[in-house]
C-alpha cells in the first residue's frame, strides 16, 4: 500500500495521517514486546533486525511472566499490609485485578508465539487485501470507522496519562521506606501489564472495526446491485445485463466470505485474550464500585487520596473501552441482519435467469453462515455481556460492602 496523494482535496485527516497512526501503534507495540503487531507493513524488516526484535519480545515477556512475579510474591505481605482493615480489603481487590491482567499476559504471550505467522498472514495481509478490494467502494462507512479510531486512540492515551499520574501521585503521597517503594513498583508493573494486553486488544478492535466498515460498504454495493436489477427491462440486452449482474453478485459473495474469514480468524486467535479482558473489566468495575463507596463513607473528598481518585477514573475509562469493543461486535451483528434484509428485497430475476437466481441463493446461504463467533464457544461478545459484567460486579460489590461494615464494627 502507498501513502495517499496529499494534493487530493477530498482526503480526510485520517486519509492523510492514517499510516502515521499505524506506525505509532507498531512502535508502541514493539516497546512492550508485541513485535507481531504491525497494522500495515510497509517493507520487510532485515533479518538481523527481525531476529533482534523477536528475541527482545521473548525476553521482555519472560521478565514480566517469570522474574517480576517472584519479586512481588516475595513482598506480598508488604503490598497488602495496612493498619486500616478496610483499606487492606481494597488492596486485596486491586491485587486480584493485577492477577487477572497477569493471566491475560500469559495467554497473550502464548497466543502470539503460536499464531505468529497466522496473525500476519490471516489477519494483517488479508485485511490489506480487502482494503484494496474496497478502495472504490462507497466512502460513507469510512466516517464512523474514522470516528471510532479517533475515539479509541484518544481514550487509550488518556488512560495511559491517568495511570502515570496515579503512579506519580502514589510515589509523592506514599510513606517512606520499603512499603512505599514496593507499592510504586507494583503500580508500574500493573501499568506495563495493562499496556501489554491492551496492544493486542487494540489490534483486535482495529480488525473488527475494519470488518464492520467492509460489511457496510458491501451492503451499500449490494443495495446498488438490487436497484440495478429492479430496473432491468425486457430488451435485447437483457441476457447480457443478467450476466453482468451475476458476475457482480459473485464478486460480492466472495468478498463477503473473505470478510467473514477475517473476523473468524481474528476472533479465534484472540478469544482467550478477550475473555481475560472481560474478567479484567469485571474486577475493575468491582474496584470502582468499592472505591466510590469508600469515598461516600468518608463523606469528605478532602480525605480521599489522589491515587484513589485516579484509580476510579481509570476504571471508568476501562469500562468504556470494553464497552466500545463489545459495541463493535454488536454493530457487525446488526449489519449482517441488514444485509440479509437487503437480500430478501431482491426481485425475481426476469426471464428466470438461472445463473442470477443461483447467485442470489448462494449469497443468501453465505449470509446464513455469517454468524457472530462466540468467546471460547460460551458467550457472544456484545452489549448484553458488558451489561452482565456490570451487574455481576455490582453483586460482588454488595458482598464487599458487607465485609466492610463488618470490619467497621470490629475496628
Give residue ranges: language-model regions:
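Helix-loop-helix junctions within predominantly alpha-helical proteins
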Residues: 56-110, 129-204, 223-238, 288-317, ...
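Terminal membrane-anchoring module of integral membrane proteins
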Residues: 2-59, 159, 235-411
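Loop-centered beta-sheet repeat module
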Residues: 199-220, 225, 246-259
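Short, non-transmembrane cytosolic segments of multipass membrane proteins
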Residues: 2-21, 98-115, 214-242, 343-344
Amino acid at each position: 500500500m502507498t501513502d495517499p496523494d496529499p494534493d487530493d482535496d477530498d482526503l480526510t485527516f485520517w486519509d492523510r495521517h492514517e499510516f502515521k497512526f499505524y506506525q505509532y501503534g507498531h512502535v508502541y507495540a514493539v516497546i512492550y514486546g508485541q513485535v507481531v503487531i504491525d497494522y500495515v507493513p510497509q517493507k520487510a524488516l532485515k533479518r538481523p533486525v527481525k531476529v533482534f526484535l523477536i528475541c527482545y519480545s521473548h525476553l521482555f515477556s519472560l521478565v514480566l511472566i517469570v522474574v517480576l512475579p517472584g519479586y512481588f510474591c516475595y513482598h506480598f505481605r508488604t503490598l497488602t499490609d495496612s493498619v486500616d482493615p478496610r483499606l487492606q480489603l481494597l488492596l486485596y481487590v486491586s491485587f486480584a485485578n493485577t492477577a487477572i491482567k497477569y493471566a491475560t499476559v500469559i495467554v497473550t504471550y502464548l497466543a502470539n508465539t503460536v499464531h505468529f505467522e497466522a496473525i500476519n498472514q490471516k489477519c494483517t495481509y488479508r485485511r490489506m487485501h480487502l482494503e484494496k478490494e474496497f478502495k472504490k467502494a462507497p466512502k460513507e462507512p469510512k466516517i464512523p470507522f474514522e470516528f471510532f479510531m479517533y475515539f479509541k486512540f484518544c481514550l487509550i492515551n488518556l488512560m495511559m496519562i491517568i495511570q502515570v499520574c496515579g503512579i506519580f501521585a502514589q510515589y509523592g503521597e506514599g510513606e517512606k521506606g520499603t512499603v512505599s517503594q514496593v507499592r510504586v513498583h507494583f503500580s508500574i508493573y500493573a501499568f506495563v501489564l495493562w499496556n501489554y494486553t491492551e496492544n493486542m486488544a487494540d489490534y483486535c478492535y482495529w480488525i473488527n472495526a475494519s470488518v464492520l466498515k467492509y460489511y457496510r460498504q458491501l451492503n451499500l454495493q449490494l443495495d446498488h446491485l438490487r436497484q440495478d436489477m429492479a430496473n432491468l427491462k425486457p430488451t435485447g440486452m437483457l441476457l447480457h445485463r443478467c450476466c453482468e449482474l451475476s458476475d457482480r453478485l459473485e464478486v460480492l459473495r466472495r468478498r463477503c466470505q473473505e470478510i467473514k474469514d477475517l473476523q473468524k480468524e481474528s476472533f479465534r486467535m484472540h478469544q482467550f485474550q478477550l475473555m481475560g479482558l472481560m474478567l479484567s473489566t469485571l474486577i475493575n468495575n468491582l474496584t470502582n464500585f468499592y472505591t466510590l463507596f469508600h469515598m461516600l463513607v468518608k463523606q469528605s473528598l478532602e480525605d480521599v487520596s489522589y491515587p484513589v481518585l485516579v484509580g476510579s477514573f481509570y476504571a471508568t475509562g476501562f469500562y468504556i473501552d470494553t464497552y466500545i469493543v463489545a459495541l463493535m461486535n454488536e454493530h457487525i451483528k446488526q449489519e449482517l441482519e441488514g444485509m440479509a434484509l437487503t437480500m430478501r428485497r431482491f426481485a425475481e430475476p426476469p426471464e428466470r435467469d438461472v445463473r442470477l437466481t443461483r447467485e442470489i441463493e448462494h449469497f443468501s446461504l453465505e449470509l446464513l453462515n455469517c454468524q457472530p463467533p462466540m468467546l471460547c464457544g460460551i458467550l457472544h461478545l456484545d452489549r448484553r455481556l458488558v451489561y452482565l459484567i456490570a451487574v455481576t460486579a455490582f453483586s460482588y460489590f454488595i458482598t464487599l460492602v458487607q465485609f466492610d461494615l463488618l470490619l467497621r464494627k470490629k475496628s
